[in-house]
């Protein structure tokens, strides 16, 4: 039974990421946003967490899903499922990244959009749970992508450059065809610097004094939604950045704790006139 498309011809995207059950990030953000873009989402959780990992929630519970990932993929392989898009995020181990490379080999067709959001670190440092071997495995996974979306710290780690390397240097050092570096600071602004099919693109917005948890997940989800609806990468970047900025402003207006997540639901509701 070939399940390359669903009955309506709707685009289908596999999401390989963690599921934080409480708090807004990763799969709990990607699934509703992509659904609002008219994209069927197929989650493949790398881990399930009681909450996201920000300090506001204290000690969280986490369950590794490596064995389940392999079993789910084996069943999907029997069904001959193919995907129009595949987006990866957090991995709990090098083993999971090796699995992801095999998953791309088995489930991506010639026209499948492959996006890797290489979760590695932030604020100039590798996350404490990761190792140099993990960085090397992420580098190898990125080679299979048409587009990667690292923040500035992750871009430096992938490129093997110092944390103070200019963004232009990072973009030249990264060999993936399309790269969007997120969270780039410029004075009182923050934004995106990209190399898309050889062309440099940048977008900046006013910077808030606090960090908002899950902003990158909201951006990547909207970016995938734009791309899956046929927009070219520069236009998709522009529109996804605008969507993310609207979510930030809505979160400001609500006065929600910045560590909880963005009020993206308000923007989806407003844009669909509900």
Question: How should these model regions be labeled?
Answer:
Residues 2-116, 120-123, 128, 265, ...:
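Conserved N-terminal subdomain of the carbohydrate kinase-like
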Residues 21, 200-214:
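Short pre-catalytic strand/loop immediately N-terminal to key active-site residues, enriched for Gly-Thr
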Residues 120-123, 155-156, 208:
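A short, flexible beta-alpha/helix-coil linker loop
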Residues 234-274:
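Charged C-terminal helix
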């Amino acid at each position: 039974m070939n399940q390359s498309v669903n009955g309506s011809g709707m685009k289908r995207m596999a999401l390989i990421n963690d599921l934080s059950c409480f708090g807004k990030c990763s799969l709990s953000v990607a699934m509703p946003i992509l659904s609002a873009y008219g994209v069927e989402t197929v989650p493949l959780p790398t881990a399930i967490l009681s909450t996201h990992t920000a300090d506001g929630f204290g000690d969280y519970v986490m369950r590794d899903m490596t064995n389940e990932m392999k079993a789910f993929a084996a069943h999907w392989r029997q069904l001959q499922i193919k995907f129009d898009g595949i987006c990866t995020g957090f991995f709990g181990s090098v083993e999971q990244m090796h699995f992801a490379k095999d998953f791309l080999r088995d489930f991506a067709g010639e026209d499948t959009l492959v996006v890797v959001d290489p979760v590695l670190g932030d604020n100039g440092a590798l996350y404490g749970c990761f190792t140099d071997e993990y960085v090397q495995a992420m580098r190898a996974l990125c080679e299979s992508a048409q587009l990667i979306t690292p923040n500035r710290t992750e871009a430096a780690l992938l490129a093997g450059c110092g944390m103070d390397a200019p963004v232009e240097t990072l973009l030249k050092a990264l060999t993936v065809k399309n790269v969007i570096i997120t969270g780039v600071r410029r004075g009182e602004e923050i934004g995106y610097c990209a190399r898309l099919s050889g062309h440099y693109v940048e977008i900046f917005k006013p910077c808030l004094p606090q960090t908002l948890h899950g902003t990158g997940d909201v951006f990547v989800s909207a970016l995938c939604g734009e791309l899956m609806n046929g927009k070219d990468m520069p236009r998709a970047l522009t529109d996804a950045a605008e969507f993310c900025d609207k979510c930030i402003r809505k979160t400001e207006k609500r006065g929600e704790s910045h560590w909880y997540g963005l009020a993206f639901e308000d923007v989806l509701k407003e844009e669909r006139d509900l």
